[in-house]
Amino acid sequence: MRVQITLACTETGDKNYITTKNKRNNPERLELKKYSPRLKRTTLHRETK
């Protein structure tokens, strides 16, 4: 079952990205390095509720 999630920057708190994930394969929170437009560099983004 795929669900839609939001990824928020850990440094600014901005919610920059929306993606989907499979809860059965990835039950824990997703963490990805993505580009932050405000900081103009890549930062760690975590899944938010």
UniProtKB/Swiss-Prot annotation:
Record flagged with keyword Ribonucleoprotein: yes
Residue stretches of biased makeup (Basic and acidic residues): 25-34
Gene3D superfamilies attached to this UniProt entry: Ribosomal protein L33 (2.20.28.120)
Alphabetized GO MF terms: structural constituent of ribosome
Any one of the GO CC terms: ribosome
UniProt keyword annotations, A-Z: Ribonucleoprotein, Ribosomal protein
Stored SUPFAM superfamilies: Zn-binding ribosomal proteins
Keyword Ribosomal protein: yes
InterPro entries found in the cross-reference section: Ribosomal_bL33, Ribosomal_bL33_CS, Ribosomal_bL33_sf, Ribosomal_zn-bd
Segments for region (Disordered): 18-49
Pfam families documented for this protein: Ribosomal_L33
Family assignment from sequence similarity: Belongs to the bacterial ribosomal protein bL33 family.
The protein, known as: Large ribosomal subunit protein bL33
Organism: Lysinibacillus sphaericus (strain C3-41)
Gene: rpmG
